Every structure is written in C-alpha cells, then in structure tokens.
C-alpha cells in the first residue's frame, strides 16, 4: 500500500475518542494507542520527526491503520489496555505486562465485604468498574465509608459463628468504622440495606447518597472543621465525574460475537466485535456491494457466516440488531435494553464511521466517480429520465406580508454553485400571495434563461408542496418547457415529494444521499432568501429613518444606506466615521437627531 493510501486513511479518520492500531506490510500488529481525537493523534505521528529512533522506525513501518471508535476517553484507555494484552504489539513494550485496571468488589458472603481488586473471581461476587486510576477507587471507597460503616475483617461471619461468639470486636468498632456484626451487634438485614445503597452508588445512581455526603460536609463546616469539610468537597467533585460503567469491559458479557449493519443504496457495511471474558478483543468492518435489492437481513446473514468462518469464531451466542437465521446451534440475541444493547450500539457506531470514511476516501481519490455515483442514485430515486447535474430550488420569503422576496439556489453535480444564485424582489404581487409570487419568479427566471440562450436545469425543486408546485407548473407550461425540465415539490415533511399530476407523494428513505442533497438545497434556498429579506427590511427601516432627518437629501441617504445597511449600525457609528462619509455638517445633524430620539 502506497504512502498516498496511508495519507488517505489518516485524512478520513474521525474526530472522536477511540483506539488506533498500526500494522506493517505483512499485516502484523505494530502498535496500539488510545486517543481523545483519533484524527489529531494519528496525524501527529506523521507531521514531525520524533525524538526517539524507535518511534521513527515505527512510523516508517506503518502501512495500515485500523481503529475502533468508543464513547469516551476512559473507554479508549480501557480498550487500549485490553488490546495491548491480547495482541501483544511489538512497540508497546512498556505495557506488555499483566497489569489490569482495578475493580471494586462486593463479596458474596454474609455481611459482604467491599474492597478493591485487580483479579476477578467467579464465585458470585459483584464487580464494578474497571477504573482507570486507584485514586478514583480510593475516593469512592472513602466516601462510602463516611456514610456506611462496613466491616473490614475477613472473618467467616456465618450465623453459627456469630451465635457461638467466635469473634470479638476490634479497634474499627471502637472508633466507629464498624457496627460489630461479628458479635451480633448489627443485624444482617440492616447490613444488607447498606450494601444495597452502596450497590446503587457503584452503578452511578447516587443522587440520594450525594445529599447525605453534602449533609456531612455541611455539618463539618458548621462545626468549624473546615479542612475535613474541604476534603469531603473534593471527594464529592470526583464522585460527580465518576463513570459508573464501561461499554468496553463488562464482566456480565462473556464470549459473544456482535454484528451490526449500516446500508445505503449501493452497499452494506457490517461491523463485527468479538467479546471474550467481558472485553473487546477484535473489531472488523466488512463492505458488501449490492448486486440486486438485497435486504439488510440477507446481507447480515451472509456476512455473519463469512466472518465466523474467516476468524474461526466458536462462540455460541451472537448479538444482532434483528432476527437472523444462521444455524440451530447459535443463540441469536436482539437486545432492547441494558449492557448488550450498549455493546450493539457501539458496533453500529463503528459501522457508520467506517461507511463515512469509505465515502470520504472515494471523494478524495476519485471525485468524478463519487459524483457519478450520487447522480446515478438521484436519477434512480427521483425517477428522472436524465441525471440531475443541474438543479435549481425556489423558496419564497414573505414575513407578515412585508418586503416579499424569493430565492433561487443552484446546485451543479450535487454541490452549491453560489455564483449562479439569484434573488428576486416580488414586483407584480400585492400582499402575501405565495402562489402568485412563485409564478412571477419562475417566469422571470426561465424567460431570461431562454432569452439569453442559457443552459436550463435538469431538475427544478419547489419548496412548498402541491400548491406551489401547481403555480410553478403553470409557468413551465406557458414557457413550453413541460417535458424539457423535470419539476417536483417538497412538502413540509421533507421526505414527501410531489410530482405533476400525481396526488400520491414519493417517500424517500431518511438515510438516502438523495434526501440529504434535497434537504441541503432547501436549507440553502431558505437561508439565502431569509438573508436577502432581512437585508431588505434593514435597508427599508434605515431608509425610513433617514428620510425624517432634516437637511438630509436623497443622495446622502443612498450613501448612508449603502455603507451602514441598518439603523442600528448608523446609530452606533462614531461622528467621525459618518463625517468621513458625508461631511462634518451633515454628520452632526444625524448624531444630534438620534441623540434627541434616544432621550
């Protein structure tokens, strides 16, 4: 793969958190890294000469860049750690040990203990995390202990042992950190109530507990214990930023494969995540070109079989967005809520980003092919006889019947051609009449193009639905252009398109590029028209205001209108700025006039 191909991969990376992976020409993993912004981080490797020889050698070997997009920077850190341990990249020397991030464990036992750990034991205990720093773990545990006195001993507090007085209370009991469950001084029911509250805190549901923490802080401050109150305040701030759950590592999800699909008119993009022991260990996205009108279900089933065979996947459960048929021995899960739904959404996110990147790459490498593809798709979607290489869209701007104007925007090859934009002052229509206004501007536009022998558009889009379409069509017939130019109307609901002589609208897929371009056309026509209307109103207001100033003639008035464009800007202008334009005497008249008006 050439350098240009590598640059192309970098240019189309997303500006999102994630993990990037570098591969050499033989497909061997070189390096795994995390990023708050994938594009910026990866670009930094190639934009400078590095201080260390090792990094310079690494950069020279990179041929392929892969990445996984994740929701947060914390998730990126966790995924990086996990992939480094799984893939053992050559250049991640410092992170190739067995270090894992800490968890908080609620031990499955009578009078459950709460403690940090790096190892997970499958004995029914509950684990929360992982956390990216032990400081966060310590703060959470300290705050919990402020509210909930729990035992710290490792005694076997069975009912029998307690009844036989096998244990004695320790110093923790005497200083108030424990309620003496070992001697039966606290009931299991009361202790369990505390554990339930702690469980909610660790899940991130700590609204009620936060009130209690703040109450402790307030009491300390009222009793003049300001240093202790400040420490509690700092801990609360850390807790407020605490992320209770990671999408990347979840002990409840064991060995499962996740498949999702994002498709358009030409292709489908299937993302695959492999989950092993609660962690993502592989991500891959496959593109399948459509031959016929294959459904997403057909394409996803095909991809699942292909990917399971390619990567020799043996998991007995798969997570998918809808039901699929892939064999009797595989459990198919379509999650609606919870952890599995979150991991499916992560897969969908990566499929979407991959599709965007592929389209960007095509646009950079072969812009003509990219345009041809879009034009062919628009021709098919809109049932046109020719590709809509030249589109014009009309919009009326008529607010409260004042200063009626209209706008015509032009797109060529799917892109705005701003030099061809035109706006119109409505000349022949009195009062608010959108239908008559549309007739006027369509007539003026195409009568002029015909008189000047200018090229006509392939498609006219009328913003306003059936009524506006009928008005425009009347003029198209009058100019003998019916059949020479295609014309459609857009209803208020953007996905509804109306055609001449057809009362039933055409509905476009909300994901289609055709609809996106039509939406862009309408938004641009609306923006262009509103801007012109606003400027016209401002000039009218300025004109009206200046006309009332004694000693200011028409020529001076036009000079001021051309320069300031609005009353507000004229009022705020310094006298010197005005005098430089029209002379000291007239400038004084204007500033005195507005000064008296304000007073």
From Swiss-Prot:
SMART domains the UniProt entry points to: GIYc
UniProt keywords, alphabetically: Cytoplasm, DNA damage, DNA excision, DNA repair, Excision nuclease, SOS response
GO biological process, one term: SOS response
SUPFAM superfamilies noted in UniProt: C-terminal UvrC-binding domain of UvrB, GIY-YIG endonuclease, RuvA domain 2-like
Keyword check for Magnesium: no
Molecular-function annotations in GO: DNA binding; excinuclease ABC activity
Keyword DNA repair carried by entry: yes
Entry-linked Gene3D superfamilies: 5' to 3' exonuclease, C-terminal subdomain, GIY-YIG endonuclease, UvrC, RNAse H endonuclease domain
Record Pfam families: GIY-YIG, HHH_5, UvrC_RNaseH, UvrC_RNaseH_dom
Residue ranges that the Swiss-Prot or TrEMBL entry lists as coiled coil: none
Domain GIY-YIG: 15-93
Function according to Swiss-Prot or TrEMBL: The UvrABC repair system catalyzes the recognition and processing of DNA lesions. UvrC both incises the 5' and 3' sides of the lesion. The N-terminal half is responsible for the 3' incision and the C-terminal half is responsible for the 5' incision.
Assembly notes: Interacts with UvrB in an incision complex.
Similarity remark: Belongs to the UvrC family.
Protein name in UniProt: UvrABC system protein C
Species of provenance: Flavobacterium psychrophilum (strain ATCC 49511 / DSM 21280 / CIP 103535 / JIP02/86)
Gene name in the database record: uvrC
């Amino acid at each position: 793969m050439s350098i240009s191909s590598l640059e192309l991969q970098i240019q189309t990376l997303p500006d999102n958190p994630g993990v990037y992976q570098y591969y050499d020409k033989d497909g061997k993993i070189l390096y795994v890294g995390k990023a708050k912004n994938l594009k910026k981080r990866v670009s930094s490797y190639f934009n400078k000469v590095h201080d260390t020889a090792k990094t310079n050698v690494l950069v020279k070997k990179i041929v392929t860049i892969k990445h996984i997009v994740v929701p947060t920077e914390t998730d990126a850190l966790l995924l990086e750690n996990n992939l480094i341990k799984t893939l053992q990249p050559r250049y991640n020397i410092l992170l190739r040990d067995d270090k894992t991030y800490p968890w908080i464990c609620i031990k499955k036992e009578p009078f459950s203990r709460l403690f940090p750990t790096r190892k997970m034991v499958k004995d029914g205990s509950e684990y929360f995390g992982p956390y990216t720093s032990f400081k966060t773990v310590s703060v959470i545990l300290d705050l919990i202990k402020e509210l909930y006195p729990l035992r710290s001993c490792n005694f076997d507090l069975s009912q029998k042992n307690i009844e036989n007085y096998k244990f004695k209370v320790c110093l923790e009991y005497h200083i108030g950190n424990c309620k003496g469950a070992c001697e039966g001084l606290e009931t299991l029911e009361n202790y369990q109530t505390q554990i339930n509250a702690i469980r909610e805190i660790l899940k991130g549901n700590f609204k009620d507990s936060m009130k209690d923490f703040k109450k402790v802080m307030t009491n300390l401050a009222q009793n003049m214990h300001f240093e202790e109150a400040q420490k509690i305040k700092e801990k609360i701030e850390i807790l407020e930023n605490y992320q209770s759950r990671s999408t990347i590592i979840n002990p409840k999800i064991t060995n499962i494969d996740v498949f999702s699909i994002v498709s358009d008119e030409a292709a489908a993009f299937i993302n695959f995540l492999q989950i092993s022991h609660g962690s993502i260990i592989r991500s891959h996205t496959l593109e399948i070109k459509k031959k016929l009108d294959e459904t997403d279900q057909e394409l996803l089933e095909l991809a699942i079989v292909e990917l399971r065979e390619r990567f020799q996947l043996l998991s007995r459960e798969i997570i998918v967005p809808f039901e699929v048929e892939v064999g009797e021995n595989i459990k198919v899960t379509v999650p609606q809520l919870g952890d599995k739904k979150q991991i499916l959404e992560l897969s969908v996110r990566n499929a979407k980003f991959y599709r965007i990147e592929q389209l960007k790459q095509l646009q950079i490498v072969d812009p003509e092919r990219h345009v041809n593809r879009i034009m062919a798709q628009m021709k098919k979607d809109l049932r046109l006889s020719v590709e809509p290489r030249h589109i014009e869209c009309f919009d009326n701007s008529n607010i409260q019947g004042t200063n009626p104007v209209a706008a015509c925007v032009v797109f060529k090859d799917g892109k705005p051609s701003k030099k061809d934009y035109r706006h119109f002052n409505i000349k022949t229509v009195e009062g608010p009449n959108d239908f008559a206004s549309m007739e006027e501007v369509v007539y003026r536009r195409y009568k002029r193009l015909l008189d000047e022998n200018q090229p006509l558009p392939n498609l006219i889009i009328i913003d306003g639905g059936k009524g506006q379409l009928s008005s425009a069509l009347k003029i198209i017939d009058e100019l003998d252009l019916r059949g020479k130019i295609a014309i459609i109307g857009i209803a208020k609901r953007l996905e509804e398109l109306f055609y001449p002589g057809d009362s039933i609208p055409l509905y476009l897929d909300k994901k289609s590029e055709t609809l996106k371009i039509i939406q862009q056309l309408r938004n641009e026509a609306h923006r262009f028209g509103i801007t012109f209307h606003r400027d016209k109103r401002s000039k009218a207001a300025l004109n009206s205001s200046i006309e009332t100033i004694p000693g200011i003639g028409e020529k001076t008035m036009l000079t001021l209108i051309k320069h300031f464009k609005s009353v507000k800007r004229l009022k705020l202008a310094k006298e010197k700025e005005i005098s430089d334009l029209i002379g000291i005497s007239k400038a004084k008249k204007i500033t005195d006039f507005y000064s008296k008006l304000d007073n």
